[in-house]
Swiss-Prot record:
Name of this protein: Hemoglobin subunit alpha
Gene designation: HBA
Organism in which the protein naturally occurs: Spalax ehrenbergi
Example GO BP: hydrogen peroxide catabolic process
Family: Belongs to the globin family.
Example GO molecular function: oxygen carrier activity
Amino acid sequence: VLSPEDKNHVRSTWDKIGGHGAEYGAEALERMFTSFPTTKTYFPHFDVSHGSAQVKAHGKKVADALANAAGHLDDLPGALSALSDLHAHKLRVDPVNFKLLSHCLLVTLANHHPAEFTPGVHASLDKFLASVSTVLTSKYR
């Protein structure tokens, strides 16, 4: 459960990301594909090379979904219901991949915002991304 302080950290971070969401989302995906090559199996139709238009487009989708979630912290299941259905029933993404992408996103954010990425912010963002992952995998059961 996200505390009021966690929610403030999440909202503040997403405000600071501003127009860089798509860029950071794509960078996190590239980082995931490089660090965890088996994740590429879910994107057989993608050019997963650095700077790929497909990775950039999917990075924007990831960033937009997380921005939506950050705007609905009190109703993550409602905000992410359609994405949960998509990932569970159509795409059938292994739930461990959400943890891998979350880790890569945290590294990306820390790299771009080192001064703001305090231990407290890191912990709050980790809890937020874990909550998002839990919601996205909730319909697997």
